[in-house]
């Protein structure tokens, strides 16, 4: 709640993680929220807000019913091991925090101005495969064999770096920076009529 000096604070922090229903569908993430408010006087009220939810989770792409009948419902052919290290070719990851600075200005009993300055910076995406997989007998990706094969190639040419029949894990990225300002002025002209005008600026 608001203290006698006009300041108020609210915050939240959570964490989750799990291994999913299907094999090779691990994931984890956090959620955070911070709000700082300051009521300068009866006319001016400020609030700063920051929130975000970084996360990553591994995926299980579509397969035929025949494959599930053969391998089981939890079968996932998008992961494997390099030595004893778990690796996946299908991972989604993202973090897009949002920052707001709000200013509420009570001009008089009939007029008010509300302004929000905001920013959102984020990046994320998903991984996938390019090239020829090598699989183990039980249907998982054989990263040891892939590593050995890739070493035997010259590394020249090939689409997306998968040269001479080799294999790579690629990442499709989405990166952006949003900045903007939203402001709204409202005044009461009479008991039955009000005037409202605003602006929405963004980059």
What are these regions (language model features)?
Residues 13, 27, 33, 84-88, ...:
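Short, well-ordered helical secondary-structure segments
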Residues 7-9, 13, 37-41, 66, ...:
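Short, surface-exposed, polar/charged, turn-prone segments marking secondary-structure boundaries
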Residues 8-17, 70-84, 154-166:
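Flexible, solvent-exposed coil segments and beta strand-coil junctions
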Residues 1-17, 22-58, 101-108:
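Transmembrane beta-barrel wall of Gram-negative outer-membrane proteins
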Residues 27-32, 62-74, 130-140, 203:
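Flexible, surface-exposed loop regions and adjacent strand-edge segments
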Residues 94-203:
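Face-selective signature of the C-terminal outer-membrane beta-barrel domain
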Residues 18, 22-23, 39, 43-97, ...:
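Flexible loop and strand-edge segments within Gram-negative outer membrane beta-barrel domains
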